[in-house]
Amino acid sequence: MKGSRRVRAIRVAGRAAGRDYQGRSWVYFLLSAQTRGLSLGVNLSPSGACDYRCCYCDIPKVSALHRAPVDVQGLALELGAALDFVASGQVVHEPSYSRFPKEWLSLRQVMLSGEGEPTLCPNFVEVMETLVHARALGRYPFFKLVLETNGSGLQRPEVQQALELFTAQDEVWMKLDAGTDSQFHGMSGVDTPFREVLARILELGRRRPIVIQSLFASVDGSPPARGEIQNYVRCLGLLQEQGAVIQRVHIQSVMNWVESSRCTHLPLAILSEIACQVRRELGVEVEVF
Ligand code: SF4
Protein backbone atom coordinates (compact mmCIF):
# COMPACT_ATOMS: atom_id res chain seq x y z
CA MET A 1 0.00 0.00 0.00
CA LYS A 2 1.36 3.43 -0.91
CA GLY A 3 0.73 4.89 2.52
CA SER A 4 3.06 2.40 4.16
CA ARG A 5 6.06 4.14 2.61
CA ARG A 6 7.35 7.03 4.62
CA VAL A 7 9.29 8.63 1.83
CA ARG A 8 8.67 7.75 -1.82
CA ALA A 9 11.53 8.29 -4.23
CA ILE A 10 10.68 10.94 -6.77
CA ARG A 11 10.72 10.64 -10.50
CA VAL A 12 11.61 14.00 -11.91
CA ALA A 13 14.20 16.64 -11.53
CA GLY A 14 14.01 19.65 -9.32
CA ARG A 15 12.51 18.16 -6.23
CA ALA A 16 14.56 18.68 -3.15
CA ALA A 17 13.05 15.81 -1.20
CA GLY A 18 10.95 12.69 -1.79
CA ARG A 19 7.20 12.21 -1.46
CA ASP A 20 6.58 12.10 2.24
CA TYR A 21 3.35 10.21 2.99
CA GLN A 22 3.91 10.03 6.78
CA GLY A 23 1.60 7.01 6.93
CA ARG A 24 -1.16 8.55 4.84
CA SER A 25 -2.59 6.92 1.72
CA TRP A 26 -3.59 9.86 -0.46
CA VAL A 27 -1.82 13.02 0.64
CA TYR A 28 1.93 13.55 0.77
CA PHE A 29 4.31 16.41 1.44
CA LEU A 30 6.75 17.40 -1.25
CA LEU A 31 9.51 19.99 -1.18
CA SER A 32 9.99 21.16 -4.71
CA ALA A 33 12.33 23.55 -6.46
CA GLN A 34 9.61 24.02 -9.08
CA THR A 35 7.31 25.54 -6.48
CA ARG A 36 10.12 27.01 -4.37
CA GLY A 37 8.74 25.37 -1.29
CA LEU A 38 6.31 23.00 0.25
CA SER A 39 3.48 21.40 -1.69
CA LEU A 40 0.84 18.94 -0.70
CA GLY A 41 0.43 16.26 -3.31
CA VAL A 42 -2.74 14.24 -3.84
CA ASN A 43 -2.14 10.76 -5.18
CA LEU A 44 -4.87 10.15 -7.74
CA SER A 45 -3.24 6.98 -9.04
CA PRO A 46 -2.78 4.64 -6.09
CA SER A 47 -2.44 1.67 -8.45
CA GLY A 48 0.23 3.42 -10.56
CA ALA A 49 -2.10 3.38 -13.57
CA CYS A 50 -0.64 5.27 -16.50
CA ASP A 51 -0.92 4.93 -20.26
CA TYR A 52 2.64 6.17 -20.81
CA ARG A 53 5.84 4.25 -20.15
CA CYS A 54 8.32 7.14 -19.95
CA CYS A 55 11.88 5.90 -20.19
CA TYR A 56 12.84 7.94 -17.10
CA CYS A 57 9.90 7.02 -14.85
CA ASP A 58 10.98 5.04 -11.80
CA ILE A 59 7.49 4.13 -10.61
CA PRO A 60 6.26 0.63 -11.48
CA LYS A 61 3.35 1.11 -13.85
CA VAL A 62 0.18 -0.86 -14.37
CA SER A 63 -2.13 -0.60 -17.36
CA ALA A 64 -4.52 2.32 -17.47
CA LEU A 65 -7.26 -0.36 -17.40
CA HIS A 66 -6.40 -0.96 -13.73
CA ARG A 67 -7.21 2.53 -12.58
CA ALA A 68 -8.82 2.67 -9.15
CA PRO A 69 -11.00 5.37 -7.56
CA VAL A 70 -9.80 7.61 -4.75
CA ASP A 71 -11.54 7.23 -1.39
CA VAL A 72 -12.68 10.85 -1.21
CA GLN A 73 -13.77 10.66 2.43
CA GLY A 74 -10.33 9.39 3.37
CA LEU A 75 -8.79 12.06 1.16
CA ALA A 76 -10.81 14.83 2.84
CA LEU A 77 -9.68 13.68 6.30
CA GLU A 78 -6.04 13.39 5.27
CA LEU A 79 -6.07 16.73 3.47
CA GLY A 80 -7.66 18.52 6.45
CA ALA A 81 -5.09 17.03 8.82
CA ALA A 82 -2.18 17.92 6.52
CA LEU A 83 -3.45 21.49 6.02
CA ASP A 84 -3.90 21.86 9.81
CA PHE A 85 -0.37 20.58 10.32
CA VAL A 86 1.14 23.09 7.90
CA ALA A 87 -1.01 25.97 9.20
CA SER A 88 0.08 25.20 12.79
CA GLY A 89 3.73 25.72 11.83
CA GLN A 90 4.71 22.34 13.28
CA VAL A 91 6.26 21.30 10.00
CA VAL A 92 9.39 23.35 10.78
CA HIS A 93 10.09 21.03 13.72
CA GLU A 94 9.95 17.86 11.59
CA PRO A 95 13.49 16.45 11.45
CA SER A 96 13.24 15.89 7.69
CA TYR A 97 12.38 19.56 7.07
CA SER A 98 14.28 21.43 9.78
CA ARG A 99 17.32 21.93 7.50
CA PHE A 100 15.26 23.93 5.00
CA PRO A 101 14.78 27.71 5.29
CA LYS A 102 11.52 28.61 7.04
CA GLU A 103 10.25 30.50 4.00
CA TRP A 104 10.29 27.20 2.10
CA LEU A 105 7.92 25.61 4.59
CA SER A 106 4.74 27.54 4.02
CA LEU A 107 2.28 25.92 1.66
CA ARG A 108 2.66 26.93 -1.98
CA GLN A 109 0.07 24.71 -3.62
CA VAL A 110 -1.91 21.49 -3.62
CA MET A 111 -1.01 19.26 -6.56
CA LEU A 112 -3.19 16.70 -8.32
CA SER A 113 -0.51 14.23 -9.17
CA GLY A 114 0.47 10.81 -7.87
CA GLU A 115 2.00 7.53 -8.85
CA GLY A 116 0.51 7.50 -12.35
CA GLU A 117 -1.58 9.71 -14.62
CA PRO A 118 -4.11 11.69 -12.52
CA THR A 119 -6.59 12.40 -15.33
CA LEU A 120 -7.30 8.67 -15.58
CA CYS A 121 -8.74 8.65 -12.05
CA PRO A 122 -12.32 7.29 -12.29
CA ASN A 123 -13.71 9.80 -9.76
CA PHE A 124 -11.67 12.82 -10.82
CA VAL A 125 -14.63 15.19 -10.36
CA GLU A 126 -15.20 14.08 -6.77
CA VAL A 127 -11.51 14.55 -5.99
CA MET A 128 -11.55 18.02 -7.45
CA GLU A 129 -14.71 18.91 -5.55
CA THR A 130 -13.08 17.73 -2.33
CA LEU A 131 -10.06 19.98 -2.89
CA VAL A 132 -12.13 22.98 -3.93
CA HIS A 133 -14.38 22.49 -0.90
CA ALA A 134 -11.39 22.38 1.48
CA ARG A 135 -10.17 25.65 -0.03
CA ALA A 136 -13.61 27.29 0.09
CA LEU A 137 -13.92 26.63 3.83
CA GLY A 138 -11.59 29.57 4.33
CA ARG A 139 -9.83 27.90 7.26
CA TYR A 140 -6.45 28.16 5.57
CA PRO A 141 -4.60 30.83 3.62
CA PHE A 142 -5.48 30.58 -0.08
CA PHE A 143 -3.62 27.79 -1.88
CA LYS A 144 -3.59 27.25 -5.60
CA LEU A 145 -4.38 23.92 -7.21
CA VAL A 146 -2.03 22.45 -9.80
CA LEU A 147 -2.84 19.55 -12.10
CA GLU A 148 0.29 17.75 -13.32
CA THR A 149 -0.63 15.67 -16.38
CA ASN A 150 0.57 13.99 -19.54
CA GLY A 151 -2.73 15.13 -21.01
CA SER A 152 -4.04 11.71 -21.97
CA GLY A 153 -7.27 11.91 -19.94
CA LEU A 154 -8.03 15.57 -20.59
CA GLN A 155 -10.71 14.77 -23.17
CA ARG A 156 -12.76 12.77 -20.66
CA PRO A 157 -16.00 14.69 -20.03
CA GLU A 158 -15.61 14.37 -16.25
CA VAL A 159 -12.12 15.86 -16.40
CA GLN A 160 -13.37 18.72 -18.58
CA GLN A 161 -16.18 19.27 -16.09
CA ALA A 162 -13.78 19.23 -13.13
CA LEU A 163 -11.45 21.73 -14.79
CA GLU A 164 -14.32 24.21 -14.83
CA LEU A 165 -13.73 24.43 -11.06
CA PHE A 166 -10.20 25.78 -11.60
CA THR A 167 -9.78 29.51 -10.94
CA ALA A 168 -7.44 31.82 -12.82
CA GLN A 169 -4.80 31.29 -10.11
CA ASP A 170 -4.80 27.51 -10.53
CA GLU A 171 -2.44 25.90 -13.02
CA VAL A 172 -2.25 22.93 -15.38
CA TRP A 173 1.27 21.60 -15.96
CA MET A 174 1.35 19.61 -19.21
CA LYS A 175 4.10 17.22 -20.17
CA LEU A 176 5.89 17.79 -23.49
CA ASP A 177 9.26 16.04 -23.81
CA ALA A 178 9.63 15.98 -27.57
CA GLY A 179 9.28 17.78 -30.87
CA THR A 180 8.81 14.87 -33.27
CA ASP A 181 6.98 11.55 -33.45
CA SER A 182 10.16 9.51 -33.02
CA GLN A 183 11.43 11.55 -30.08
CA PHE A 184 8.01 11.37 -28.44
CA HIS A 185 7.77 7.59 -28.91
CA GLY A 186 11.29 7.14 -27.52
CA MET A 187 10.61 9.22 -24.41
CA SER A 188 7.02 8.16 -23.67
CA GLY A 189 7.26 4.49 -24.66
CA VAL A 190 3.88 4.64 -26.41
CA ASP A 191 2.90 4.88 -30.07
CA THR A 192 0.20 7.55 -29.75
CA PRO A 193 0.57 9.87 -32.76
CA PHE A 194 2.47 12.96 -31.63
CA ARG A 195 -0.06 15.23 -33.39
CA GLU A 196 -2.70 13.98 -30.89
CA VAL A 197 -0.49 15.02 -27.98
CA LEU A 198 -0.06 18.47 -29.48
CA ALA A 199 -3.79 18.71 -30.23
CA ARG A 200 -4.61 18.07 -26.56
CA ILE A 201 -2.16 20.76 -25.45
CA LEU A 202 -3.57 23.18 -28.01
CA GLU A 203 -7.15 22.50 -27.02
CA LEU A 204 -6.53 23.25 -23.36
CA GLY A 205 -4.08 26.08 -24.04
CA ARG A 206 -6.76 27.89 -26.01
CA ARG A 207 -9.14 27.67 -23.05
CA ARG A 208 -6.75 28.65 -20.27
CA PRO A 209 -3.04 29.40 -19.79
CA ILE A 210 -0.88 26.28 -19.40
CA VAL A 211 2.55 25.51 -18.02
CA ILE A 212 4.66 23.21 -20.21
CA GLN A 213 6.78 20.66 -18.32
CA SER A 214 9.63 19.26 -20.40
CA LEU A 215 12.17 16.68 -19.35
CA PHE A 216 15.31 16.11 -21.38
CA ALA A 217 17.76 13.34 -20.67
CA SER A 218 20.68 11.52 -22.13
CA VAL A 219 19.02 8.38 -23.52
CA ASP A 220 21.19 5.32 -24.20
CA GLY A 221 24.22 7.58 -23.80
CA SER A 222 23.11 10.26 -26.27
CA PRO A 223 21.89 13.73 -25.35
CA PRO A 224 19.07 15.10 -27.52
CA ALA A 225 20.38 16.17 -30.93
CA ARG A 226 20.36 19.89 -31.76
CA GLY A 227 17.70 19.25 -34.43
CA GLU A 228 15.45 17.57 -31.85
CA ILE A 229 15.60 20.63 -29.62
CA GLN A 230 14.86 22.86 -32.59
CA ASN A 231 11.82 20.75 -33.41
CA TYR A 232 10.67 20.95 -29.79
CA VAL A 233 10.98 24.74 -29.76
CA ARG A 234 9.23 24.92 -33.13
CA CYS A 235 6.31 22.89 -31.72
CA LEU A 236 5.96 25.33 -28.84
CA GLY A 237 6.01 28.21 -31.30
CA LEU A 238 3.30 26.57 -33.43
CA LEU A 239 1.14 26.00 -30.37
CA GLN A 240 1.48 29.69 -29.54
CA GLU A 241 0.71 30.76 -33.11
CA GLN A 242 -2.41 28.63 -33.11
CA GLY A 243 -3.71 30.27 -29.96
CA ALA A 244 -2.36 28.30 -26.99
CA VAL A 245 -1.38 30.57 -24.11
CA ILE A 246 1.86 29.27 -22.61
CA GLN A 247 2.29 30.86 -19.23
CA ARG A 248 5.63 29.30 -18.38
CA VAL A 249 7.96 26.48 -19.45
CA HIS A 250 9.76 24.16 -17.02
CA ILE A 251 12.94 22.59 -18.35
CA GLN A 252 14.33 19.75 -16.29
CA SER A 253 16.31 16.54 -16.43
CA VAL A 254 16.42 13.19 -14.67
CA MET A 255 17.95 13.53 -11.23
CA ASN A 256 20.87 11.27 -10.45
CA TRP A 257 18.97 9.21 -7.87
CA VAL A 258 16.43 8.13 -10.47
CA GLU A 259 18.87 7.59 -13.30
CA SER A 260 18.54 4.25 -15.08
CA SER A 261 20.75 2.37 -17.46
CA ARG A 262 18.85 4.10 -20.31
CA CYS A 263 18.33 7.63 -18.97
CA THR A 264 20.86 9.85 -17.30
CA HIS A 265 21.01 13.46 -16.21
CA LEU A 266 21.84 16.23 -18.66
CA PRO A 267 24.34 18.87 -17.55
CA LEU A 268 22.92 22.22 -16.47
CA ALA A 269 24.72 23.93 -19.38
CA ILE A 270 22.63 21.97 -21.92
CA LEU A 271 19.39 22.58 -20.03
CA SER A 272 20.21 26.30 -19.85
CA GLU A 273 20.91 26.38 -23.57
CA ILE A 274 17.48 24.84 -24.26
CA ALA A 275 15.87 27.35 -21.88
CA CYS A 276 17.59 30.29 -23.63
CA GLN A 277 16.37 29.08 -27.01
CA VAL A 278 12.77 28.79 -25.74
CA ARG A 279 12.95 32.22 -24.10
CA ARG A 280 14.43 33.82 -27.22
CA GLU A 281 11.98 32.30 -29.69
CA LEU A 282 8.78 32.29 -27.63
CA GLY A 283 9.29 35.21 -25.28
CA VAL A 284 7.86 33.26 -22.34
CA GLU A 285 9.11 32.72 -18.80
CA VAL A 286 11.31 29.62 -18.57
CA GLU A 287 12.59 27.94 -15.42
CA VAL A 288 15.34 25.32 -15.25
CA PHE A 289 15.40 22.64 -12.55
S1 SF4 B 1 3.45 10.05 -17.66
FE1 SF4 B 1 4.31 10.38 -15.62
S2 SF4 B 1 3.63 8.62 -14.39
FE2 SF4 B 1 3.27 8.09 -16.55
S3 SF4 B 1 5.12 6.95 -17.14
FE3 SF4 B 1 5.45 9.12 -17.67
S4 SF4 B 1 6.52 10.03 -15.89
FE4 SF4 B 1 5.61 8.05 -15.23
Locate each region found by the language model.
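Short aromatic/hydrophobic contact patches that present stacked aromatics
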Residues: 39-43, 109-111, 146, 173
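Conserved AdoMet/S-adenosylmethionine-binding subsite of the radical SAM
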Residues: 119-266
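N-terminal [4Fe-4S]-dependent radical SAM core
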Residues: 1-47, 53-55, 59-77, 81-106
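A short small-residue
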Residues: 57-63, 109-112, 209-215, 253-255
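Auxiliary Fe-S-binding modules of radical SAM enzymes
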Residues: 1-35, 221-289
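Conserved Radical SAM active-site core
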Residues: 59-168
